[in-house]
Amino acid sequence: MPRRRVVGQRKILPDPKFGSELLAKFVNVVMVDGKKSVSEAIVYGALDIIATKTGKEHLAVFEEALDNIRPAVEVKSRRVGGATYQVPVEVRPVRRNALAMRWLVDAARKRGEKSMAQRLAGELLDAADNKGSSVKKREDVHRMAEANKAFAHFRW
C-alpha cells in the first residue's frame, strides 16, 4: 500500500428538489443498477407520502428517523493470541450516516407494502417514532458493544 497522500472524501452535490446533501446520499443508497431517476422517484414519493400522512415537514421526519438509527458504537473483530475478540469502537460520523441509511433501506426492502415508496415511507415513520427494524438493528449493535465492553482496552 503506497504511503502517499490521503485521498479526501468526494463532495456530493445536494439533491435538486430539497437542496440536502444527506438526501442526495440517501438517493444514491436506494439506487440499484445505476438507475438514479428511479431511486429519486422512490425517495421523493416516500417523502410525499410522509407529508400527507403526518402533515410535518418532509426533511424534518427524514432527519429525525436517521438520528434514531445512527449507531454511536459498533464492534470490530480483533485477533489477540489465538482468540478473536469483539472490540467495541466508536463509529466515525461519515460511517454513522452510511450505516443508518443502509439499515433503513434494508429494513424497507423487507417490509410488506406494495411499492418501495410505501415501504420506505413506513420505515421512515417507524424510525422517527423509535420503532421498526432499522431501530432494532441499531439497538442490537449497541447491545453487542455493551456486552463486550470488557474488551474495550484492545483498541487499536
UniProtKB/Swiss-Prot annotation:
<dbReference type="InterPro" id="IPR005717">
    <property type="entry name" value="Ribosomal_uS7_bac/org-type"/>
</dbReference>
<protein>
    <recommendedName>
        <fullName>Small ribosomal subunit protein uS7</fullName>
    </recommendedName>
</protein>
<dbReference type="InterPro" id="IPR036823">
    <property type="entry name" value="Ribosomal_uS7_dom_sf"/>
</dbReference>
<comment type="function">
    <text>One of the primary rRNA binding proteins, it binds directly to 16S rRNA where it nucleates assembly of the head domain of the 30S subunit. Is located at the subunit interface close to the decoding center, probably blocks exit of the E-site tRNA.</text>
</comment>
<keyword id="KW-0699">rRNA-binding</keyword>
<dbReference type="GO" id="GO:0006412">
    <property type="term" value="P:translation"/>
</dbReference>
<dbReference type="InterPro" id="IPR020606">
    <property type="entry name" value="Ribosomal_uS7_CS"/>
</dbReference>
<keyword id="KW-0689">Ribosomal protein</keyword>
<keyword id="KW-0820">tRNA-binding</keyword>
<comment type="subunit">
    <text>Part of the 30S ribosomal subunit. Contacts proteins S9 and S11.</text>
</comment>
<dbReference type="InterPro" id="IPR023798">
    <property type="entry name" value="Ribosomal_uS7_dom"/>
</dbReference>
<dbReference type="GO" id="GO:0019843">
    <property type="term" value="F:rRNA binding"/>
</dbReference>
<keyword id="KW-0694">RNA-binding</keyword>
<dbReference type="InterPro" id="IPR000235">
    <property type="entry name" value="Ribosomal_uS7"/>
</dbReference>
<dbReference type="Pfam" id="PF00177">
    <property type="entry name" value="Ribosomal_S7"/>
</dbReference>
<dbReference type="GO" id="GO:0015935">
    <property type="term" value="C:small ribosomal subunit"/>
</dbReference>
<dbReference type="GO" id="GO:0003735">
    <property type="term" value="F:structural constituent of ribosome"/>
</dbReference>
<dbReference type="GO" id="GO:0000049">
    <property type="term" value="F:tRNA binding"/>
</dbReference>
<comment type="similarity">
    <text>Belongs to the universal ribosomal protein uS7 family.</text>
</comment>
<keyword id="KW-0687">Ribonucleoprotein</keyword>
